[in-house]
Amino acid sequence: SVTVEMLMENFQKYKVLLTQNQNFRKLFAARLITLGGDWLLTVPLLGIIYELTENPFITSLVLVVQSAPLFLLGSFGGYLADRFDRKKIIAISEFLSGMTVLFILYAVTTENVIFILFSFGLLSVVGSPYMPTSDAALPNVVKKENLAEANVIFFSSWGVMAGLGAGLGGYLTTVISRNMLFAIDSLTFVLSALIVFSIKKNLSEKNEDKNKEEDISYKEGLQYAASKKEIFSLIITKATFSISASGLLSLFTVLSYDIYKTGDFGTGLMFGARGVGALIGPIAIRYFFGRTDGKLLNTIGITIMAWGLFYFFIPFS
């Protein structure tokens, strides 16, 4: 049938990107490792804060300090990616992230909740240039006709590692100590930087290829986003959704510790299940409902409502 043929054609495009494009494969692998490093920390930190405070609200701040800097500084990371060597930006960001993980390890030993939250927020601050820089480098390693599929793979990477990283983080805390997990995690960021540096192709756009009209300041970029209703609405939607999600997802830890008595392992399983959904969702939505950007925009409100509805049923499980 036509549907099966289209499905096989799309699958073939994804397969070619992952098996025949070495530069893309390396950039994607580095992204997976970095996201995995972030999520390895999240589950044990949620458990640590909840053990110290037994307060769901304070526990939710772990996810707030993780996501807020990415939202606030992400556009600045894009600004840096347009003006400086992208490999160097990634290397500096990853090196600082690895050092910050060791700083988090020290903060945990103090059992000072504010200090722990501050150190975890600092990890998001120093790591904030990585994602926009990695995104900006994508057209440098992928042909224009394959860019749509590459974007789907790239943005589904969050779901892959939210599942694998969080699940693995929860499991590893039952095998090794949390402190050992933090020490190992610091090395993942170094590994990611090394992989990116092994990419032979230049990841930075050449200045002569850029249109002068595109060379705008960071302030002008913010003003442009604020002046465009569609862009501004998407930014507000993303920000408010992240805030509400942080409060809700922190309850995974409360459920795992107080109801199911499964500790970090149970929290990791729940975050892992969420990650599987986040992996399947973008691919399924694009295939069935959003073949164009306009159609994709129309699915945002419906999917957010569906997200809330499904989480509504968790207390009845």
Listing of model-derived features with the role each one plays in the protein:
Residues 7-24, 202-236:
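Juxtamembrane intracellular "pre-TM" segments in multi-pass secondary transporters
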Residues 25-43, 63-79, 85-99, 115-174, ...:
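Substrate-agnostic recognition of the 12-TM MFS/MFS-like secondary transporter fold
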Residues 43-56, 250-265:
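Short amphipathic helix-loop junctions that connect adjacent transmembrane helices
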Residues 46-52, 105-106, 164-184, 258-259:
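Transmembrane alpha-helix termini and helix-breaking/packing motifs in multi-pass membrane transporters
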Residues 50, 103-107, 123, 196, ...:
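MFS-fold secondary transporters
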Residues 72, 89, 103, 114, ...:
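C-terminal transmembrane bundle of multi-pass solute transporters/carriers
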Residues 98-99, 105, 186-193, 305-309:
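Small-residue-rich packing faces within the transmembrane alpha-helices of Major Facilitator Superfamily
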Residues 136, 140, 182-212:
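Helix-loop junctions on the cytosolic side of multi-pass membrane transporters
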